[in-house]
Amino acid sequence: LHVVSSDLKSFHKVWDVPYYPNSLVIPETSFSNKWENSIFVGYCKGTESRGGVYEYPLNEERIEFEITNSDSDLLTVDHSKYQIANNFVCVSDMEINQNGEIFVVDHVSNGAIYKIVPKL
């Protein structure tokens, strides 16, 4: 994920995401198989949505995105199909426990912690 300010876009090939990435987590390989080879991006409210969490697949080596796209261009990815949670104000941190549950810290007036569990 390469994010730069809008005034620098002409100098860089960027992934123009519709949100502001704020936290990243890659589960350890010993964690739940549901999240194996995934990267999670927590984000703050953007121009098109409130805050939330995206799950993007990684390749077997866990070093590149494994995103199916007609032209394999990250600039044209439909991010909505990777969203697994939304309606947060701003995801400021995420952690994943041994059971594969994702704990999300939402930066609201007094703060809140939510748990996201894999669908069975």
Which residues fall in each region the model found?
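Beta-rich catalytic cores
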Residues: 20, 87-90, 109
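Residue position within the beta-strands of beta-propeller blades
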Residues: 41, 103-106
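C-terminal alpha-helix/helix-terminus motif
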Residues: 106, 117-120
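Beta-propeller domain segments
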Residues: 1-81, 99, 111, 118-119
